[in-house]
Amino acid sequence: DLHSFPTRRSSDLEPAESLADDMVTIKAAYDVVNKNPLGSAAGYGSSFPINRTMTTKLLGFADLNYNVVYAQMGRGKAERVVAQSLANVADTLSKLSMDACLYLNQNFGFVHFPAELTTGSSIMPHKKNPDVFELIRSHCNRIKALPNEITLMTTNLPSGYHRDLQLLKEHLFPAFKTLKDCIEMAGLMLSNIEIKKDILSDEKYKYLFSVEEVNKLVNAGIPFRDAYKKIGLDIEAGKFTYQASVAHTHEGSIGNLRF
């Protein structure tokens, strides 16, 4: 984490909880589109005595688009709802990928990946490039633009069917495979991640524990502003001492990550 206080790498499992929320939006999108539009014909229903309930059951839809006009008007909306659910997953993966790229670089060095999952530099033999995560990030950022593309393509269309709607397929359908590939690539990378041990033993991280020392004084009854000032003065005077451990926790924090 980039804030200046200690945490644990398990805190970076937040994408798991984010993906759990993303699944809620995917289920919601599925519920929106799991309705039978057949029988709406050119947009105003059929003059034949068809049984739309029967076709709904035979095709496995959960329900009907009852209003035949809405069955046509829902085109564009259905694609946009699905695209947004895909974009939510893509957003989670792109952020995860950015963090992985950041934590891999030499200024952090928090994580490591096997050589076969990284690429070398064109001129620097010591460097390992996180190309897989960079490609995931780029693909997912493109998917995040998809809801806006669909919104713009369907703006100001009057009720009914229009040939404009045909173009939605070539934007939406490839996104399913792209996102699936990104999920699989992320899974492969994370299954091979290596976390650096004893990161906080590095001298440059000693001031991360300044907050913990302030908290100790506060818990001992010293007002926060006074504790804050004391630790700050100790740091300026070169007298700051600390223990490289954290004594507190709560639900969802260090050592207590459950959901």
Please report, for each region that a protein language model flagged, where it lies by residue:
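Acidic side chains
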Residues: 1-3, 18, 22, 99, ...
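Short, surface-exposed helix-loop/turn micro-motifs enriched in polar/charged residues
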Residues: 1-2, 30, 201
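Short, small-residue-biased leader/transition segments that mark boundaries at the very start
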Residues: 2-10
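Internal glycine-rich alpha/beta core junctions
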Residues: 9-153
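Glycine-rich cofactor/substrate-binding loops
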Residues: 109, 124-259
